Regions:
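Aromatic- and Gly/Pro-rich amphipathic surface segment
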Residues: 35-63
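Calycin-type beta-barrel ligand-binding domains and close structural analogs
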Residues: 61-202
Length: 202
């Protein structure tokens, strides 16, 4: 992968917020998804239950609400970690240190690390898939950009000596924070192979 700082900048919203949303449209969306996917073995306990287990951040510390990412200089990222209420948990400058060839989804993932002071040490190391689709796709009718990631106080907690993920089924996910409710619903629908809405249900 080619690291491009611009791909990461901006506001990011934790996918977990979609799972607990009380907006009628998102609840309708999940109801339809649950019905459409209930026969699949992976979703036997329920679609939302599956994703809450896969994407959950509570076991690693405070439940995340999202990130705010700005350019710290020409290459590095200043990442502000937000809690579920949108309040800052930590903020530090992260340096791109390389890649993991077989990371989340078996794809190349970017490795970031900060040497800055942190209140929450689990934010020291960040492993993340490049955002997909590109952020610009949204302007042309594409889905919101999203990415899967993992984080820990050190790399040994994320990657074993064999170069494989220590927790291969842990999939915290961030989505472009600029998305409308319709765009958020359509991510959920597309994930489960349902037709995207052209407008919110009434």
């Amino acid at each position: 992968m080619n690291y491009e700082q611009k791909d990461w900048l901006g506001s990011w919203q934790n996918f977990e917020s979609y799972l607990v949303s009380t907006t009628p449209a998102m609840q309708t969306c999940w109801t339809q998804v649950e019905e459409a996917a209930k026969a699949l073995p992976m979703f036997q306990a329920g679609v939302k239950t599956f994703w809450q287990r896969a994407c959950g951040t509570a076991l690693a510390g405070p439940v995340l609400g999202g990130w705010q990412i700005e350019a710290a200089n020409a290459q590095d990222l200043r990442i502000t970690w937000l809690d579920a209420a949108g309040q800052p948990l930590d903020s530090a400058v992260y340096h791109f240190t390389g890649t993991l060839e077989k990371g989340l989804e078996g794809k190349v993932c970017a490795k970031f690390e900060t040497a800055g002071a942190l209140q929450h040490p689990q934010f020291r190391c960040l492993l993340a898939m490049p955002p997909m689709p590109e952020r610009t796709a949204r302007a042309h009718g594409g889905l919101l950009s999203h990415l899967h990631f993992q984080y820990a106080a050190g790399w040994t907690a994320l990657v074993g000596t064999d170069g494989k993920l220590s927790h291969p089924m842990w999939y915290p996910t961030m989505c472009d924070g600029a998305g409308t409710l319709l765009e958020q619903c359509n991510i959920v629908r597309a994930m489960h192979h349902l037709t995207c809405w052209t407008e919110l249900p009434v």
